[in-house]
Amino acid sequence: MENTNIVKATFDTETLEGQIKIFNAQTGGGQSFKNLPDGTIIEATAIAQYKQVSDTYGDAKEETVTTIFAADGSLYSAISKTVAEAASDLIDLVTRHKLETFKVKVVQGTSSKGNVFFSLQLSL
């Protein structure tokens, strides 16, 4: 099963286990970051990013979905440019240091225009 919409992951997406993780992320999605209180810390075992096409009011656009896999089996997902940028760097760091578990803090902010946005921090 070749999945060409995978952007990046902290695990091997070519193995059966990796493909199951991606399948679950794409079909289940998990809990949205929008439903998490600001400052929520997720005990994570993996992160993946993939592309999906969203159709909003007849305007199809490609977006990056970021999914965090928690140690308890839960999934947390977001479609957010700021999350995607932070997660991309986080995936590099986790992969480089071969971290098996790590704590991700979901940070909520408000732009000068009043829009809510999310980002990620690595928590110690």
Swiss-Prot record:
GO terms for molecular function: DNA binding. Keywords: DNA replication, DNA-binding, Early protein, Viral DNA replication. One of its GO terms (biological process) is DNA replication. It comes from the Viruses. Single-stranded DNA binding protein required for the elongation during viral DNA replication by strand displacement. Displaced viral DNA strands are transiently coated with the ssDNA-binding protein and therefore protected againt nucleases. The latter is then probably removed by the replisome that performs lagging strand synthesis or during the events that lead up to the recombination process. Has helix-destabilizing activity since it removes secondary structure from the ssDNA in replicative intermediates. Belongs to the phi29likevirus single-strand-binding protein family. Monomer. This is Single-stranded DNA-binding protein. It comes from Bacillus phage PZA (Bacteriophage PZA). The lineage of its organism: Viruses, Duplodnaviria, Heunggongvirae, Uroviricota, Caudoviricetes.
